[in-house]
């Protein structure tokens, strides 16, 4: 039986020498691979009390929405600044070279709601840490964070003070595809 890792295409030396590019689109292009990825993420949520699934831009939307559907929960978006039309709250966080800002609608999370945060990948953890801070600022409680892939050795998990689970663990200097 295939594992999720078997569906992840690896492209050596892209976009530069020494990088092992992990292409998540190969999972999405294979119905069995995509179903397996979602099924494995659902298993990580067994017994977790949650009211809302929050997907981080942009691949967190791809994996978060089917999880929300399967679990009968609403799906909310954590987006890059300037992409949401209503009143928002925002959080700026550090990148390796510079900063980035994410935001959520102010009415996306209600006080006391338990939230599962979903993304495709954890590397350094900065984006998800900022997303969790937004959720807490809105009065929500982070129940769990679920990733499809975790890059071992980058210590992103250690940055997060929450229950974190990943479907698969990958090693090496890696960049994943960018869908937007």
Swiss-Prot record:
Its main location: cytoplasm. Keywords: Cytoplasm, Glycosyltransferase, Purine salvage, Transferase. GO terms for cellular component: cytoplasm. It catalyses: AMP + diphosphate = 5-phospho-alpha-D-ribose 1-diphosphate + adenine. It holds the Pfam family Pribosyltran. It is found in: Cytoplasm. Disulfide bonds: none annotated. It is an enzyme of class 2 (transferase). Pathway: Purine metabolism; AMP biosynthesis via salvage pathway; AMP from adenine: step 1/1. One of its GO terms (biological process) is adenine salvage. GO terms for molecular function: adenine binding; adenine phosphoribosyltransferase activity; AMP binding. Its EC number is 2.4.2.7. HAMAP family: Aden_phosphoribosyltr. Catalyzes a salvage reaction resulting in the formation of AMP, that is energically less costly than de novo synthesis. Belongs to the purine/pyrimidine phosphoribosyltransferase family. Homodimer. This is Adenine phosphoribosyltransferase. The gene is apt.
């Amino acid at each position: 039986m295939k594992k999720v890792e078997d569906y992840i295409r690896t492209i050596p030396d892209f976009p530069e020498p020494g990088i092992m590019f992990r292409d998540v689109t190969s999972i999405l292009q294979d119905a069995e691979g995509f179903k397996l990825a979602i099924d494995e993420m659902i298993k990580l949520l067994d017994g977790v009390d949650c009211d809302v699934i929050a997907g981080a831009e942009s691949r967190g939307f791809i994996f978060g929405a089917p999880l929300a559907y399967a679990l009968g929960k609403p799906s909310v978006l954590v987006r890059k600044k300037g992409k949401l039309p209503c009143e928002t709250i925002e959080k700026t966080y550090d990148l390796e070279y510079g900063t980035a800002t994410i935001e959520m609608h102010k009415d996306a999370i209600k006080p006391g709601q338990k939230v599962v945060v979903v993304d495709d990948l954890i590397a350094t953890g900065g984006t998800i840490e900022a997303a969790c801070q937004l959720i807490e600022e809105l009065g929500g409680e982070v129940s769990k964070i679920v990733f499809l892939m975790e890059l071992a050795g980058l210590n992103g998990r250690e940055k997060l003070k929450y229950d974190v689970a990943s479907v698969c663990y990958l090693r090496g200097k890696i960049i994943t595809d960018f869908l937007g």
